[in-house]
Each structure stands twice: as structure tokens, then as C-alpha cells.
Amino acid sequence: MNQPNAESIVRRATAAFNSGRPDEARELCEKGLARTPGEPMLHHLLAAVLFSKNEIQPARKHVETSLARKPGNAAAHLLAARIARAAGDFDAALLHLDRAITIKPQRDAFLEKARTLDQSGQRPLAREAWRAILDVVPQHREAAARFGRLAWEDGDHTAAAAYLERAAVTDAPASVWFDLGLVRQDLRDYDKATAAYRKALDKKPDYAEAALNLGIVLQEAGDLDSAMRAYREAYRLRPQAFGKIAMALTSASHGRLWIDEAALRRSLGG
């Protein structure tokens, strides 16, 4: 019986991987590499399978082997960049991305570069990269969310609000609604900030920081009873937030002076 060739194994392994059977895909790749060591397609696919299982270092080894055997593969450079970013090796990730973009400019590579610049703390370059994506795809939600967050960190609240409102659609993650709450809070739009923080908590009920900030904006809006309920939830989720809650209660324009720390803890349910 004829042994399956590498392309046949890749097709079967890819089908298994895409059907949610990564262990089968891994076994096929490993058997294929036992027959044809160094086959770049199999190393590439095995790297993708391992990466999906968060086996970062083995995945990195296989994708680098694939590139050594078949230089100039844009898809392999993109995968190598993602794996390097996951490993925290941002310089290597950016090097792979620049090579991928040179070989075959495509949206996924530019998006991955923006993520890498952002995660590595290169804020001016990250903001520029996210903005470039928005220039081409104005409704790109991730780009709008990250550009908005960076604009807020730079003190550009007007731009931050505009882009975060674009990103804050029904299925947006809790982090986007939280960031929108921060911007609206800084703009002293407490009603909209309240709505954003509530949405963040709807998405992620254990979001202690959102509960804390919800308490602060409710307090600023003069609704101290609702603020206390939010503070109780924040304290329940994260008892370490007690100091921030106490500070907020005594420093805001609508607050209460708590001289007895134990009494405040009891009021918060502690």
C-alpha cells in the first residue's frame, strides 16, 4: 500500500484541526515528520496545532524549522510573529511581521503588528498603527477600541470617546465598555459613565474595578445609596479595594466621613 505523501497528511491534519480535533492533527503531523523529517508544511501545521494548545516553545521551534526549510513564507512568518508575541519576545515578533509584510502585505499582518507594538508598550507607534488600520477599515472594532484607549491615556478625551463609542457595540467585551466608562467619567458625563460601567459588569460580573468605578460615578452624581451598593459589590469581589472605597467616600463632593474603619467595613458587608 502506498504511504500518504506530505501534502495528503497536511490536508488530513488541517481538516482534523479545523474540525476541533487538535490531538488527531498533532498525531498526523508527528507521524508525517517521522516519515519525512524537515517537511516545512508539516512543521508549520504542527506549530499551529501546538500554539492552539498554548505549547509556546515547541510551537516556536517547529515554525522556525519550517522557515529555515522554506524561507519567504509570509504565513509562516505571521505565525512565528504570533508565537513570539505570546512568548514576550516582541523584537522577534516585529522582525517576523516586517518580513511578512514585505513578502505579502495583508490586513492580518498589519493588525498583528499593531497588537505587538501595543503590547510591548510602544505607545506612539501603536497608536499610529491602529490609526492606519482605521484609515483603511473605519469600523474595525478592535482598532477603534485600542486607539480610543491610547487616546484616553494621552489625555485626548474627545478622540477617545469618539472611537470607544464606535467600538462599544452590543457584543463588545467588558474591557471596551470599561474604557468607555473611564472616558465618560473624565468628561463628567456621569449618566453615560454609569451606563458603560453597568454594561461592563453585565458582560463580566466579577469585574471589581468596574464595580468600584460605578460606585464613584454614582456618588459623583449624588446617588449615594446606589453608590454604596456598588461599593459593597466591589468590596465583595476584591476586599483589597477597601482603601480606594474609603478614599472615594471621603474625598468626593457627595460622600460621607467614616471615622471608624470597622463601621465602614461592616457597612460594606465585611
Residue ranges and their predicted role:
Residues R35, R69, T102-I103, V136, ...:
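Structural marker of alpha-solenoid helical repeat scaffolds
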Residues L45, L79, E112, R146, ...:
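Canonical tetratricopeptide repeat
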